[in-house]
């Protein structure tokens, strides 16, 4: 089977801010960091990119700027999810001719639709564009679980090409592959189980850890996809503390602080209601960076 466009280590990119406003010069530097490190793709304005506290205009501008800075060297996946189908369609249409390689759309959050509601939500979005669509299932945040059976139904829609599964439940992977087909792209949304998912046939991971360990994550995924699991595991174990401790507080709070400590961004700040990493949690994240050999 040919290597899919969406594979390997795909960073769920932070959105750098200075005094509460998006810092586009730093965004350009982050994109360059990932291009040079060998990152296989960038998700722009997903959960880690603070999508919920950016306006639609800001969402679109950040994504378009990310495409501009990447200049065709790395595929950009636009975060276009919403818990209102109409808004998700608007955002998707605004980006249809922007140069993005595809869209990542989170399961509608808070309003807790049924499986049929989720199916119709994604069907409507997919029918509004020719862009490839990646489903995003993260029940811990949305309050709703997109079941494998529903994913299988959605896989019949031509431009729904894959899923980001952030449940961490590896038993779902073979079932999703069975229901959706072997060509349906499975991307782990859980760094701690990302390598294990690739051992089971997953194609990669949409990673938070990648923000601060881009070269290591790219190498780990390349080794795993080549079947060199022992070598990949050695890297994975060195990063395991980061995989866990970057979630010591709600993402992206810890990873922005970690990126700040490494000098990748000039401020660790986020937009309210998210706040900077608490002082009590900072030693834990610092220790994880040290274990990973990044400091």
Swiss-Prot record:
Primary enzyme class: lyase
Amino acids binding pyruvate: 48, 206
A Pfam family annotated for this UniProt entry: DHDPS
Positions bearing the site annotation: Part of a proton relay during catalysis: 47, 110
EC nos: 4.3.3.7
InterPro entries associated with the record: Aldolase_TIM, DapA, DapA-like, Schiff_base-form_aldolases_AS, Schiff_base-form_aldolases_CS
GO cellular component: cytosol
Reaction(s) this enzyme catalyzes, per UniProt: L-aspartate 4-semialdehyde + pyruvate = (2S,4S)-4-hydroxy-2,3,4,5-tetrahydrodipicolinate + H2O + H(+)
Record keywords: Amino-acid biosynthesis, Cytoplasm, Diaminopimelate biosynthesis, Lyase, Lysine biosynthesis, Schiff base
PROSITE patterns, alphabetized: DHDPS_1, DHDPS_2
GO biological process terms, semicolon-separated: diaminopimelate biosynthetic process; lysine biosynthetic process via diaminopimelate
Active-site positions on this chain: 136, 164
Pathway as given in its UniProt record: Amino-acid biosynthesis; L-lysine biosynthesis via DAP pathway; (S)-tetrahydrodipicolinate from L-aspartate: step 3/4
Subcellular location(s) per record: Cytoplasm
MF-aspect GO terms: 4-hydroxy-tetrahydrodipicolinate synthase activity
Gene3D superfamilies: Aldolase class I (3.20.20.70)
Function: Catalyzes the condensation of (S)-aspartate-beta-semialdehyde [(S)-ASA] and pyruvate to 4-hydroxy-tetrahydrodipicolinate (HTPA).
Record text on subunit structure and interactions: Homotetramer; dimer of dimers.
Family statement: Belongs to the DapA family.
Protein's UniProt name: 4-hydroxy-tetrahydrodipicolinate synthase
Species this chain originates from: Actinobacillus pleuropneumoniae serotype 5b (strain L20)
Origin organism lineage: Bacteria, Pseudomonadati, Pseudomonadota, Gammaproteobacteria, Pasteurellales
């Amino acid at each position: 089977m040919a290597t899919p466009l969406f594979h390997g280590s795909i960073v769920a990119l932070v959105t750098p801010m200075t005094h509460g406003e998006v810092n586009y010069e730093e965004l350009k530097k982050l994109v360059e960091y990932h291009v040079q490190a060998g990152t296989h793709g960038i998700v722009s304005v997903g959960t880690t990119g603070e999508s919920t506290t950016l306006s639609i205009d800001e969402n679109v501008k950040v994504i378009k700027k990310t495409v501009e800075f990447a200049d065709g060297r790395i595929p950009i996946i636009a975060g276009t999810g919403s818990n209102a189908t109409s808004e998700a369609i608007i955002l998707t249409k605004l980006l249809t001719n922007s140069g993005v390689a595809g869209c990542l759309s989170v399961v509608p959050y808070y309003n807790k639709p049924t499986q049929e509601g989720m199916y119709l939500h994604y069907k409507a979005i997919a029918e509004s564009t020719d862009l490839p669509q990646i489903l995003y299932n993260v029940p811990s945040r949305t309050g709703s679980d997109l079941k494998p059976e529903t994913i299988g139904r959605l896989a019949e829609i031509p431009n729904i090409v894959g899923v980001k599964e952030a449940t961490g439940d590896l038993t779902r992977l073979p079932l999703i592959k069975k229901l959706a087909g072997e060509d349906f792209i499975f991307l782990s949304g859980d760094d701690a189980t990302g390598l294990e998912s690739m051992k089971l046939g997953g194609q990669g991971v949409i990673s938070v850890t990648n923000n601060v360990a881009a070269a290591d994550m790219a190498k780990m995924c390349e080794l795993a996809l080549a079947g060199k699991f022992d070598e990949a595991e050695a890297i994975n174990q060195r990063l395991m503390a980061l995989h866990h401790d970057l979630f010591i507080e709600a993402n992206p709070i810890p990873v922005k602080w970690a990126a700040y400590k490494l000098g990748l961004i000039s401020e660790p700040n986020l937009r309210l209601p998210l706040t900077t990493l608490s002082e009590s949690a900072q030693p834990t994240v610092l220790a994880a960076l040290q274990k990973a050999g990044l400091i």
